[in-house]
Amino acid sequence: LPALLPHGTRVFLPALPADPPDAISQALGLLRREGRGLVPVPHVAATRVASLDALERRLDAWQGAWGGALREVLVVRGDAVGHSTSGEAATGAARGAFGCSLDLLQTNALQRGGFERVWMCGHPEGVAGVSAADARSALREKLSWADAEGVAAGVATQFCFDPGTTLGWVDALRDEGSDCDVSLGVAGPASSELLRRMADRCEVAPPPSPAANAPPATTDADAWPWPYTRELARWQAARGAERGVQAFHLYPFGGLRPSLRWLRAASRDGATAGLGLDRLEWPEQAEGVL
């Protein structure tokens, strides 16, 4: 499947508690062999890093797996109870050298390891019992660190089902003066049951219930995420590229292939014009497969 991804796609590689230590290195090797023109973004779970030395050895291993050309990374807090992209403001004691992702960032180990862009987590609805305001305060501290260090920063947000909440969160970020890239979390096509299950697991508000007389398509993967992305397209057109978002952070809960089929259809859909999906460069292998 990596060979079917559009050229230039960022592929975020989560750091999950149950994964073996070399899981991300193996994933990087796979992407290097089978993907073309992809941009890997491995996750560092700060509170699960045993020491600064362990962090530096891990970064070196990742660089080795990608031929020394790895330039982007996403830093999360990494609580065992959190979702793979949750956690900067999540509760729970540190199990390693760092109490939060800012502690790790301030070592400057990422810059020494060759990384030029650091992605951070955005939580429009808050996370793990922490309010959206407190989560934003934690994000603001990390963005201030990036500004002071001259590090390019990006924010990848948790998925939400209420466009008003998500887009209002981005508006507030821009009103604070931040011009960092925002990759907006979007749950890929999946059944209503699965979307609700993932919402519960990731502690976000569930998708709205379909009307009792709704046709079947509104309760399965054929419906979502069209309503959300079309609302996003209208919002983006009103804001412009600089105050809007720069990318989707697609969560393929229903499977990568269905998500790619949806993305390909969305790139040809006039209602999503302005999101830049029409500029995606699909590999020849995608023809007739997606």
Task: Please tell me what each predicted stretch does.
Residues 174, 226, 230-290:
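Structured C-terminal cap/extension of enzyme domains
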Residues 131-147:
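Active-site glycine-rich loop that binds ribose-phosphate moieties when present
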Residues 42, 142, 151, 184, ...:
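Conserved, mostly hydrophobic/aromatic
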Residues 180-243:
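Catalytic-face loop-and-helix region of soluble metabolic enzyme cores
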Residues 1-136:
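Active-site beta->alpha loop and helix N-cap motifs at the rims of alpha/beta catalytic domains
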Residues 81-88, 128, 186-202, 257:
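Flexible glycine/acidic-rich beta-alpha junction loops that bind and position SAM and/or redox cofactors
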Residues 12-13, 42-44, 154-159, 247-250:
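Short catalytic-loop micro-motif centered on adjacent basic/acidic residues
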Residues 34-37, 107-116, 145-153, 231-247:
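A structural motif corresponding to the C-terminal end of an alpha-helix
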